[in-house]
């Protein structure tokens, strides 16, 4: 199979808050081959205690993955736990990790924060 078809592309968006404030999500673009690890980071707006991760597969609606209240998991009903993991540690960016990427993981991953 051609490398083009086995390439996993993960695009990240920035979530906007109030003017001058925004969620910092890194990296902005991430390309991985099948079976490789992918890790994304999200620094919420200062003072926000809730963090949300979403996934949008091409031409589909955003799918909720997981949310945190401070460093505690608040809701993980959408998280595919076999290969995906997420955490929020105090005074550190939150992270979303895919252990062994698959083609169907190609998506936009979006992080948002709220008070």
From Swiss-Prot:
Gene3D superfamilies in alphabetical order: Immunoglobulins (2.60.40.10)
Domain of life: Eukaryota
Protein name (Swiss-Prot/TrEMBL): T cell receptor beta variable 16
Gene Ontology BP, a term: adaptive immune response
Pfam family, one: V-set
Residue span, Ig-like domain: 21-115
Alphabetized UniProt keyword annotations: Adaptive immunity, Cell membrane, Disulfide bond, Immunity, Immunoglobulin domain, Membrane, Receptor, Signal, T cell receptor
Signal peptide extent: 1-20
Organism ancestry: Eukaryota, Metazoa, Chordata, Craniata, Vertebrata
Role of this protein: V region of the variable domain of T cell receptor (TR) beta chain that participates in the antigen recognition. Alpha-beta T cell receptors are antigen specific receptors which are essential to the immune response and are present on the cell surface of T lymphocytes. Recognize peptide-major histocompatibility (MH) (pMH) complexes that are displayed by antigen presenting cells (APC), a prerequisite for efficient T cell adaptive immunity against pathogens.
Main subcellular localisation: membrane
Subcellular location, record wording: Cell membrane
Disulphide bridges: 42-111
GO cellular component: plasma membrane; T cell receptor complex
Subunit-structure text: Alpha-beta TR is a heterodimer composed of an alpha and beta chain; disulfide-linked. The alpha-beta TR is associated with the transmembrane signaling CD3 coreceptor proteins to form the TR-CD3 (TcR or TCR). The assembly of alpha-beta TR heterodimers with CD3 occurs in the endoplasmic reticulum where a single alpha-beta TR heterodimer associates with one CD3D-CD3E heterodimer, one CD3G-CD3E heterodimer and one CD247 homodimer forming a stable octameric structure. CD3D-CD3E and CD3G-CD3E heterodimers preferentially associate with TR alpha and TR beta chains, respectively.
């Amino acid at each position: 199979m051609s490398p083009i078809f086995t390439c996993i592309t993960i695009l990240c968006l920035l979530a906007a808050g109030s003017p001058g404030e925004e969620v910092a999500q890194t990296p902005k673009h991430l390309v991985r081959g099948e079976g490789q690890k992918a890790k994304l980071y999200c620094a919420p707006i200062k003072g926000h205690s809730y963090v949300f991760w979403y996934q949008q597969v091409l031409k589909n609606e955003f799918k909720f993955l997981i949310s945190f209240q401070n460093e505690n998991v608040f809701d993980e009903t959408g998280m595919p736990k076999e290969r995906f993991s997420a955490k929020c540690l105090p005074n550190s960016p939150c992270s979303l990790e895919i252990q062994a990427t698959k083609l169907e993981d190609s998506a936009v991953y979006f992080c948002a924060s709220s008070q």
